[in-house]
Amino acid sequence: MTSPTTNFALVNNTGSSDAYAYVTGLDLGDNNAPVFIQSDGKTVYKPTSPSAPQSPLAADVAIPLGAAGSTTSVTIPHLAGGRIWFVVGGKLTFVLNPGPAIVEPSVTNQDDPNWGLHWGFAEFTYNDVQLFVNISYVDFVALPIALNLRNASGAEKKVEGIPAGGLDQVAQKLEAQHAADGAGWDKLVVRDGAGTLLRALSPNSGRVADAGLFEGYYGAYVDSVWAKYAGEDLTINTQWDWGNLQGRVVDGDVLSFGDQGTFAKPSAGDIFSCSTGPFGGYPKDKADVLGNLGARLAAAFNRSTLLRNASQPDGEQVASYYQEAVTNHYARILHEVNVDGRGYAFPYDDVVASGDDQPDQAGTVFDGAPDLLTVTLGSLQAASDGGDKKEKEGDDATPGKEKDTTGLWKGFLGFVNKATGGCFGRS
């Protein structure tokens, strides 16, 4: 059982005194009511339902981060679906709709008052069991954010985030990928009217802004996968009570897992979202098992490993991810640019092979006895071209993933998040 509250230390490493944080979440002790932490960093603001949409907040929820180099303390109660929002060079605008429901900043709506600001967030859930945190790139990448979680015994886990100039690297690499294949990766790079780089969108967010983006992109690859598994089994280790399940393409049409259900061919939009087409709308009586299978299929499509490995996710090696010409190059580039190679780049980036003792790709930190989470806004390291992802000698590296006997690492695997109200892999 965790303490009723935990402590966050927010470090302003931006070089600017015009930086703010916001904390939102769902109150686990009050039927998931939406809450903010107020500007003092400790008082909970629980908005009431307004009479009209787009109503202003009744409290100041902008937490000033102070002068460059300063640290601000924040007290966090048990929350699900939490986000720590950061902005530099202004303040974010949050409003309320009846419910109440928080209207959050948008990166896909140019009419949103926050669209032209430099902002980003990390995600967390703090419940009776643990504090679980990640840097999310599922929607976009913008500001450098780093995590360091210290537990009650003094042990630390960390995620280093993108380096100084990391967003510029991401933009350059996306534009270079478009120059190589003409697929539209450059359209993920977002600049304001003056040409200032604001952020890079994920392919899924890019398709929200432009529904035709990447149309047909995965078509030939999916056809090749279907042809391969018309002649051999695809084995998926569910890493759960269902064990290994075998799939085979039948009638040239669907990938069938027998009595468990089938998957039609996914489109690029389905693959990038991980939640539409064959990866969503499961029959109620099979939702759990198909959600599990769908998570592993979606991860393998994003990483483009299905033609290389007929046993998913077992046998997967990080070095084999994103090696095909058709792949999620946004995810590839994010992992290349991050200092330690870790960060949630698509909704099921937490899928890993059983027995994998390497640090997770998703860039999570979690502990059942958290003492202090330090979240640094602004890079901890200077720019490099992706750099050496190995920890330097003497550094306190994040240990490998804790496992239970089924090989499921002790976080919230993507489909479990959705079922339990977790915050990870949202878009």
Which residues does each predicted region cover?
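Extracellular low-complexity, O-glycosylation-prone Ser/Thr/Pro/Gly-rich "stalks"
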Residues: 2-427
